[in-house]
Amino acid sequence: MNNIAYKWQTRWEEDKIYESNPNPSKPKFFTTVAFPYPNSPWHIGHGRTYVTGDILARYKRMRGYNVLFPMAFHYTGTPIMAMADAIAKGDKELIETFKDIYEISPDVIPRMSDPLFMANYFKEDIKASMREIGLGIDWRREFTTIDPEFSSFVTWQFHKLQSKGYIVKDTHPVGWCPVHHIPVGMHDTKGDVEPEIGEFVLIYFNSEKGIFPAATLRPETIFGATALWINPSEMYVVASMLGKKMILSEKAAAKLSFQIDDIEIEEKIKGSKLVGLKVENPITGKHIAVLGADFVDVSLGTGVVMSVPAHAPFDYYYSKKTFKNNNIEIIPVITVEGLGNALAKDVVEKNNPKSDEDLKKLTEYVYRTEYNKGVLRSDLGNLIREEYRNELKSLGGLPVPKGRELITNFLISKGLGRKIFEVMNKPVYCRCGTEIVVKILKDQWFLDYSNKEWKELARKSLSKINVIPEESRKDFEFTIEWLEKRACARTRGLGTPLPWDKKWIIESLSDSTIYMAYYTISHKIKQYKLSPSKLTQEFWDYVMLGIGNLEEISEKTGIPSNIIKEFREEFLYWYPLDIRHSGKDLIPNHLTFFIFNHAAIFQENLWPKAIAVNGLVLYEGKKMSKSLRNIIPLRKGLKMYGVDVMRIAVSSTADMGSDVNFSESLVKTVGETLRKMYELFKSLDNYTGDILGFPEKWLLSRIYEITSSTTRHMEALELRDAVNELLFVFSSDLDEYFGMVSAEGREANNKVLREVLTIWLKLITPFAPHLAEEIWHEILKQKTYIVNEGWPEVEGSKMDELTLLEHEYMKRIVEDIRSILNIFKGTPKLIKIYALNDSRYMELLRDAIVANGQMKKFMDIHKPKSREDARILQKIFNESLEIDDKMKKLVTNYNINEVDVLNKLSKYIRRKLNVDILIEPYDEEVKKTYNKEAMPLRPAIIIE
């Protein structure tokens, strides 16, 4: 099969069928998939997003659209630099991965210490992967993000953002690599993890040795603090910090030095030496003890935490272990209606946790419940020291969120605390291997995603975007709301210099937000050999926004006006972007930035129309990782399993938002089904029948029904449902057809079979284009490319709804009989089917269906005259509630006689059951003899 794939990939490329140019006579469809970082080869997991985009592009092309599907490569930022650095340092694990898993020559690997060599090497490798998996890309438009022509476009973009006030110089917390001294985002970290920055509140507890700054996410619980926890096994320091002598963990002091200037270590001390000290609660004035607990994470916050047993499951659980006599002080602070005022204590007692993992789950429940439903107790004033009581009198009865805000502001205003920042999803590691910290960055350039005006534009844009799957919309909405300032430049890495401050390089998630617009004209820059110096701000203003005087711009740039106009027209032909494909992990950054930046720069009619996000690819149920040794390089996978099998397996065997589970059994099933279809096409000439009977009408109707449902699935990107119908349901339909003609003792109809299979071949083309092209040319002897053929139309087709519904009715009867046979003792010799032959019963069922579940309405029409009438009407009404939509359609749209239908289909029923059958009209004699009653669509079935 791979020879077939290579043959057609070569032919398509030679004939340039994916090179797309404006064609005003056709509707356009512009689709893009995130361009890749060329810092390693692709494995099978990379294929999903790209094949999904390709399948949709191929489908739209067959629907008559002029489709543009381009590709480029993302050289910007630190991903490539970090990988090259690792090679230069002799990173054993990485070198072994390249050598053993990806089979890169040992002679080549050392040369990858040069970032550009690495990027260019893997660019060609990834490009080969894209070609080999059959992506129909217009390669004329290819570029890299360090091409000077593209840099001129990014420079223009940043001038636009700055002119609108969306780029600011500010002080702000950022994820930070302590080794490289640069801000770090998702694409700079191992595993592409976005550092999530959150706030802790420090509360200052005085002691004779200094201040213990307890770090908390819940400052409102300070009133219930009964102790402080520290880790007795770890090192702590006495440090001069913020003009105060503070006691915190050694690791915390090192980490906080990136947020607080001039921290000086005066003394190092073992945590165990601090246990037993007394500290003063700054709000209540109460003196409490410092206790030791190994569960305290000294790298989180300050390594000092409050113990609030009433509201923290960990604190209650470990207080019980510490105070063996169970003499635990409980000071309730928060009341939850119906759940009392000491929720942590109650849930620990009730659930009896066995591990820290159990305690974490209880903690999440308590924190969430108290935050959403809790209020501060009304008599809170009794716990507050007198000097603050008046200022804090409004706290009692407040909902927890408001109480938290009030007490935080109070602590800071009185000098009793401050805020610090933490990586909430720690540990997150830079690609160099260093753990990320939070740094308060001064004089840094930020994209100000907190700008209210800009947020509103993003919300408006999102409201017009078709998000696939729709349930991902809430993730976009959430991201838009929480996004704040984001560092947009680094002092290290590849990329475009910040135009007004060239010591900074624009980072990778900031130069990749509107590059889709650049695709529309990138090939023309090459075609006309335009130098980057000619691609001025005025040039881009005109091409992208229609701003400026064409003749003046032509004179200034030296580019003929007709060429500039050609650029503008091509851009307007393709834009807006019709759909953007990416992994769902990029919603919290790239995809939302994509929305923001388009909304900021382009007019509303050029905003993106749709975004499709997909899940990951697992291997045998597990995430692919080096440690599990379960990574399959994509190019190797294509050789092992076949191109079209891989395309289907990685893209179309799970819902869009779910993870695909790639497995040996999956690819085997897909491969066997494709091969079965291939063999059937090869054997077409063996079928010589010409009878057009019920089986042929049914098969023709089925292929058009499948065409209709596949079209619906493709429009919604429900690829799993489409593949299920095309491969597995249709394969079963073919078995059914051959079974029916066999029951009639005749050959299959060659003409019908050829027509049906040709329609199927077109439907499967977006998924398996290589196999489809081979069959189209070599077996069906066609001269055109099937990938350029039109999509099958259902309108005016040979679909016979009654035939489909009669077959569905037969299927239902067979299922009923089989369920009886399952409990039948002995060997059945004859099955008697007694069906109603009285049209009045079918009319009653029709009326019951029309009543749509309203029994009174149904009974009012038919008014039972006896108990027996009422019983029968009740049974028919119940039947109307139980039957599916297809059977309802059969009853309401057609006047069928069940006996006639069953007699017509009796040969097929007999073959399915492999038992003699007798079909007779139902009458009262049957009821007397067998004590069985027939109802509409429910014949009486007797097995002898």
From Swiss-Prot:
SUPFAM superfamilies, sorted: Anticodon-binding domain of a subclass of class I aminoacyl-tRNA synthetases (SSF47323), Nucleotidylyl transferase (SSF52374), ValRS/IleRS/LeuRS editing domain (SSF50677)
Residue positions binding ATP: 626
Motif annotated as 'KMSKS' region, chain positions: 623-627
Protein name: Leucine--tRNA ligase 2
Reaction(s) this enzyme catalyzes, per UniProt: tRNA(Leu) + L-leucine + ATP = L-leucyl-tRNA(Leu) + AMP + diphosphate
EC identifiers of the protein: 6.1.1.4
Cell compartment(s), UniProt: Cytoplasm
